[in-house]
């Protein structure tokens, strides 16, 4: 079925409840600033038009424009896929690998057809990078990330947008005063930014401190380069009111 762009929470609720029926529903969370989302959009649209997916609903959700929906599923990074069936989350996937997405969708279709899926209810969902079903959790415990894998993941994250803020909570609901202040500074200077909620991923939270050689949060990255925490950003702006714009252009 063709991709449906979600414009508000009322439309989303209708399509995932009243109009859902027995259909499998794929939620694709994205933003306009994340480069990986641009390529995945084409893949998402192409797969939605395949005849074999005629009984699957594909919903495209801008995570920035639909913050209430993003917060409902605790989305902390994009691109992010969630596959649901009859109000139940079947699978989740964070990242921009088309092969993983296609494989995940096929698994869910087969699972629904066989009626043997193990699921989590939407009300109890903790939708976040690294959250899977119990079987997946066992695999993760056995296969911890190596330092090289962690650094590769962090490198992708700090480059996910030209300006990336690693904070506690979200811009609409910061979980600490320092994060709230830095969000305010970026908005005051009309800087468009991506964010990552470090409270949703303990691995990122702990390892980013080493990666940045900085012990506290929030942390601001511009063009993949660490700029500092709240105090450093304040000092930089006192010295140069156009610091943020200059850092973006460098």
UniProtKB/Swiss-Prot annotation:
GO BP field: actin cytoskeleton organization; intracellular iron ion homeostasis; iron-sulfur cluster assembly
Keyword Membrane: no
Glutaredoxin domain span: 151-250
Signal peptide: none
UniProt region (Disordered), positions on chain: 113-150
GO molecular function: 2 iron, 2 sulfur cluster binding; disulfide oxidoreductase activity; iron-sulfur cluster binding; metal ion binding; RNA polymerase II-specific DNA-binding transcription factor binding
Keyword field: 2Fe-2S, Iron, Iron-sulfur, Metal-binding, Redox-active center
Biased composition (Acidic residues): 134-148
Record-linked InterPro entries: Glutaredoxin, GRX_PICOT-like, Monothiol_GRX-rel, Thioredoxin-like_sf, Thioredoxin_domain
PROSITE patterns on file: GLUTAREDOXIN_2, THIOREDOXIN_2
Purpose of the protein: Monothiol glutaredoxin involved in the biogenesis of iron-sulfur clusters. Binds one iron-sulfur cluster per dimer. The iron-sulfur cluster is bound between subunits, and is complexed by a bound glutathione and a cysteine residue from each subunit.
Note: Present with 11000 molecules/cell in log phase SD medium.
Family: Belongs to the glutaredoxin family. Monothiol subfamily.
Protein name (database record): Monothiol glutaredoxin-3
């Amino acid at each position: 079925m063709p991709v449906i762009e979600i414009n508000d929470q009322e439309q989303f609720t209708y399509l995932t409840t009243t109009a859902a029926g027995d259909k499998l529903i794929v939620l694709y969370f994205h933003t306009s600033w994340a480069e990986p989302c641009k390529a995945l959009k084409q893949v998402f649209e192409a797969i939605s038009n395949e005849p074999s997916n005629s009984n699957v609903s594909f919903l495209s959700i801008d995570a920035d424009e639909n913050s209430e929906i993003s917060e409902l599923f605790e989305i902390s990074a994009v691109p992010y896929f969630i596959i649901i069936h009859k109000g139940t989350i079947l699978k989740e996937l964070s990242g921009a690998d088309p092969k993983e997405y296609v494989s995940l969708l096929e698994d869910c279709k087969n699972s629904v057809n066989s009626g043997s899926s193990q699921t989590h209810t939407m009300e109890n969902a903790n939708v976040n990078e690294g959250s899977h079903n119990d079987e997946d959790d066992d695999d993760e415990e056995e296969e911890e990330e190596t330092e090289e894998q962690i650094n590769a993941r962090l490198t992708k994250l700090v480059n996910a947008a030209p300006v990336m803020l690693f904070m506690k909570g979200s811009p609409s609901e910061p979980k600490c005063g320092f994060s709230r202040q830095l969000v305010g500074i970026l908005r005051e200077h009309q800087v468009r930014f991506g964010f990552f909620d470090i409270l949703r991923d303990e691995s990122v939270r702990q390892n980013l401190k080493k990666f940045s050689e900085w012990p506290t949060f929030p942390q601001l990255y511009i063009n993949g380069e660490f700029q500092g925490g709240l105090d450093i950003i304040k000092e930089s702006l006192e010295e140069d009111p156009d610091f943020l714009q200059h850092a973006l252009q460098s």
